[in-house]
Regions:
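Hydrophobic alpha-helical segments within soluble ligand-binding/sensing domains
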Residues: 1-21, 68, 118, 134-151
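Short beta-strand elements in bilobed, periplasmic/extracellular small-molecule ligand-binding domains
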Residues: 21-24, 45-65
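Short beta-strand/turn micro-motifs composed of small residues
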Residues: 26, 111-113, 167
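Hinge/cleft segment of the Venus flytrap/periplasmic-binding protein
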Residues: 45, 134-176
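Glycine-rich, charge-decorated loop segments at or immediately adjacent to ligand/cofactor-binding or catalytic sites
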Residues: 116-126
Length: 176
């Protein structure tokens, strides 16, 4: 939920008190991480940014092609969209849809995970924010847990993982 709450705060700040309308894209509402992010996103908007409307969620099955088609349709046919929040994968399709349809009226676009695609899109202004859950740390934690299980040891401590928020201005120097 924290990642969704963070995304909502960023969208709310970008809207700066104006009337807004956000498109949410999710791989699947049945995926717990996606539904948790949406729950956190909705909670913050409802509490702190009631001026921002949420349109019906687009389900893309995390497929770039489906994302491109569904988001393009929404951007072409729904007036007044001011923000996009993608809770899942399929960012290649999201980037394609925005590039094909333009950013007219969009104040902010927030996605998850820093990849080559999202890095390029941040650099050229197609998207604005990538919230990175730092998958390399999650993977290392999972491996350490598996090793502890194999060695019949208690699980290692796992401090809370704070996501990194990337903008075009603070991208890491090393390539992805």
């Amino acid at each position: 939920e924290k990642a969704g709450r963070t995304a909502a705060r960023l969208v709310g700040m970008a809207e700066a008190g104006n009337i807004g309308r956000v498109i949410i894209a999710a791989g699947s509402l049945d995926a717990r991480d996606h539904s948790d992010r949406i729950k956190g996103f909705r909670a913050v908007l409802k509490r702190d940014f009631p001026n921002i409307e949420i349109t019906p969620v687009i389900e893309t099955m995390d497929q770039p092609r489906q994302m491109r088609e569904l988001l393009s349709e929404r951007l072409r046919n729904d007036d007044g969209n001011t923000a996009i929040y993608n809770v899942g994968a399929g960012n290649e399709g999201l980037v394609d849809a925005i590039r094909m349809n333009g950013r007219d009226g969009l104040s902010v676009c927030v996605v998850h995970e820093l990849s080559t695609c999202t890095r390029d899109a941040l650099e050229d202004g197609t998207i604005d924010v990538a919230i990175d859950q730092r998958p390399e740390i999650e993977l290392n934690r999972a491996l350490a847990l598996l090793q502890a299980i194999v060695d019949d040891l208690p699980p290692p401590p796992a401090p809370e993982l704070i996501p990194a928020i990337y903008l075009r201005d603070n991208l890491p120097n090393e390539p992805l």
